[in-house]
UniProtKB/Swiss-Prot annotation:
This is Regulatory protein RecX. Coiled coil: none annotated. Signal peptide: none annotated. One of its GO terms (cellular component) is cytoplasm. The keyword Aminoacyl-tRNA synthetase does not apply. Keywords: Cytoplasm. Pfam families: RecX_HTH1 (PF21982), RecX_HTH2 (PF02631).
Amino acid sequence: MTNYTAINYLLYLLSKRDYSEQDLRRKLVQKEYSQEEIEQAIERAQANNWQSDERYCAGFIRYRSQQGIGPRRLKQELKLKGIKDWLINQELENAEIDWFILAEQVFEKKRPQVWDIKAKQKMWRFMLSRGFYNDHFSHLMDIDYNDTEYE
């Protein structure tokens, strides 16, 4: 791959999976292509719709939400990948994901057998670390899971 031009290397990368523009730039810089070559390659890829931050963002949201990741963490991860705020918000709205249902599924999967104050605190931290907002899961904390009627 040492004789690859910037556009060839970019196409090689994109043939494997989607990348954000920032990730592609970083990879091309690592391969020591000139700034001019990098700009031309990325412009050509975007003009031919080979690379699209919109498509990358939508796919990322779909993939990570299936792993039980909430909207706050998705926003944070996408910002680190160089995706603009307005695009993240737009794609989160277009994703048609019910965050309350997803939070409930994640919560039920991780809920401990013994439900005491320590377990509640642990679950609260877990749900926040997964990127859910308080209102997505706070109603789940008030249920008495030790009650036999719930089982």
